[in-house]
Amino acid sequence: MYASEHAAELVVARSLNPVLPSLKTVRRVGPDYRKGRDITGEELCATFGLCGVEYGEWLPDKERQESLNSCFDAFCDLADVLKVERTAIGFHGLLAVAFGSRGVSNALAHFEPLRFVFNLTRMKGAGSVAHEWFHAFDYFMGARKEGIKLDRRDPDLYMKTKDVVAITEQLFNDDPFADLVSGLKGHYLFGEEAKQWLIEKREGIFSRYLLAADDFVRALSEGCCCPVTADQRQRATALVDHLSSWVHDSDLYKRDTDELTRLFSDAMGWSVYRFSVSNACSRLLCIAREYLKAIESEKKNDQKVCVGRSKYYIESMLIDLGRCKPYWSKTLELAARAFGAYVERRLEADGRLSQFLVHSHKNECYSDANPYPEGDELDYIENLFDSLFSSVSI
């Protein structure tokens, strides 16, 4: 829907790489959990269940202390947003944090799933904590889904993490993570809007069916190699009329599509007929099946329906156009950025600010790209994250 309505804008290929804005000062508004005192690395690990803290060789002592204090505040804020125990933030002794070390290329922050550590680069890593933490959560839950127990004390941890696939990259159904992935990539309508869209879709398909039915009857009259008996013509016409009447059948969605095939087979009493007849018959059958599917969807999904790709997903694919392989539109990156936007919105709703944890996760902060969900899509994604974290334990 979004793509069709904004086709003219989306034609232009863009080679973009939106970068999180650097902050001169990192601000925070919220409870003073430290009571103004400095935090040690040992205290950070004990409070949040981290296995360790690593510092870059060239990180000055003052900056090291600022990083510890800011990270402590950020993790407290994150635990508040997620409503989890603080030790769950470090996955009970699994996660390590590095400040100004283990950097990768030009990344502001980077999570290493093989070692279960994320690095915040010197000066520029502020605002990436929520994003990188979700990557860790993604792999942690992926391991759990696959039955792989990750334990920092396990000498085979490195080999085990090599086999882990992020849970947002796995294929499964009827799961809060599956709902999240669908919500990230799909554009949904709800309530009366959903009902009306489904009705209009069904009516449009039925209009196409009537046209296909006319083509089928015409092909019977004009395209047969062998004479068509009056009985065959009568049965074929009756079949078309019968299918057309299904629009008034309240139990239509229960009909099996195999019944359609059988009805057509019974009607086709002759063995040799031109391609035009076969083609018209196949088209009619295909549209009839599509109509059945629309009816079934209308019965099952009258409160929610996916009508196409989300604006968030489309914009992410546009950013990837100039890249040799997808990055922004990868599922795990869509999820991590959306999580950052979710955390930022949750903090704002409570009158709080935590820029070391997350900042600038709004499209208005970027002049030529839209890397984050917004509006109604963010509203829906926010509810999905709420459902997710209320249904899983860390």
What is each stretch, according to the model?
Residues 1-63, 85-394:
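Active-site-flanking segments in enzyme catalytic domains
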Residues 59-73:
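A short, highly charged nucleic-acid-interacting micro-segment common to nuclease
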Residues 78:
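Divalent metal-coordination and catalytic microenvironments
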